[in-house]
């Protein structure tokens, strides 16, 4: 849903402005051959340095959405993950939580390299700064409901259930929520859960999910705006645009029981 929202944002802007677009997906047999004779290129997702090099051969007027590659100088639109993650964790800490776990995914580029996952990185940074060793409460697999469910079951089976969980996506959070309910853990009384993305289902979970809003559609719209501007320029200098996220408070987080007693 996250990448789909980015794509919808980009396509909506292009359609409204009567700009012709060509869609190409990595799994297509003619993936790169579709991308000839372009005025601009919007690349959504994670790409290897080799793929980025191939795209730049096609056009220097490319913009990459949700790609964090600090040593490669290309046009990028990203979220401010650092501020978002730290705001979410500070919120949990302000409620009195110190045993804060992390459930997330591992992504790979096309050449098999593990992609630098900022949410996990800033979670680790936060715990180090607090002097907390919460490594036993960490599980990483995929960004899916099924993985969230399985990772939560693993924590329950290992008797390593924290008082709060930072979930790197709403899908992961919803899977964890299901596993907790099935094993008679109350949310938020026993375990607080914080998601990430604010997808359309999070307001209707039981309880409604506290989450971090990720501006996916706006990222797509902005990419389309810039790519149309690039088309009229002879030279484009690399830039990074970082959009803010925001904490959405609902009903899945509260003080740990020790603070209430």
Please report, for each region that a protein language model flagged, where it lies by residue.
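Bacterial carbohydrate/catabolite-sensing allosteric modules
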Residues: 5-22, 40, 56-64, 68-261
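Short acidic active-site motifs
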Residues: 28-31, 50-51, 147, 151
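Ligand-binding clamshell of periplasmic/extracellular solute-binding protein-like
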Residues: 45-52, 170
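Central regulatory/effector-binding core of bacterial HTH transcription factors
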Residues: 12-48
């Amino acid at each position: 849903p996250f990448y789909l929202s980015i794509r919808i944002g980009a396509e909506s802007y292009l359609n409204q402005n009567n700009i012709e677009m060509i869609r190409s997906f990595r799994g297509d047999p003619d993936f790169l051959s579709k991308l000839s004779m372009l005025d601009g290129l919007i690349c959504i997702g994670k790409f290897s340095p080799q793929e980025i090099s191939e795209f730049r051969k096609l056009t220097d007027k490319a913009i990459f959405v949700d790609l964090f590659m600090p040593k490669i100088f290309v046009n990028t639109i990203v979220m401010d993950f650092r501020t978002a993650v730290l705001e979410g964790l500070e919120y949990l800490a302000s409620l009195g939580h110190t045993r804060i776990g992390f459930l997330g995914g591992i992504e790979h580029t096309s050449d098999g390299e593990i992609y630098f996952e900022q949410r996990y990185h800033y979670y680790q940074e936060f715990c180090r700064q607090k002097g907390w060793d919460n490594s036993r409460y960490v599980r990483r697999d995929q960004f899916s409901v099924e993985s969230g469910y399985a990772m939560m079951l693993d924590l329950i089976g290992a008797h390593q259930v924290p008082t709060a969980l930072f979930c790197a996506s709403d899908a992961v959070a919803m899977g964890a929520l299901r596993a907790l309910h099935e094993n008679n853990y109350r949310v938020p009384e026993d375990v607080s859960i914080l998601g990430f993305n604010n997808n359309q289902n999070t307001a209707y979970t039981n309880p409604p999910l506290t989450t971090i809003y990720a501006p996916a559609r706006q990222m797509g719209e902005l990419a389309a705006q810039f790519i149309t501007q690039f088309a009229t320029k002879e030279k484009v200098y690399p830039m990074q645009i970082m959009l803010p996220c925001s904490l959405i408070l609902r009903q899945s987080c509260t003080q740990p029981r020790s603070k209430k007693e």
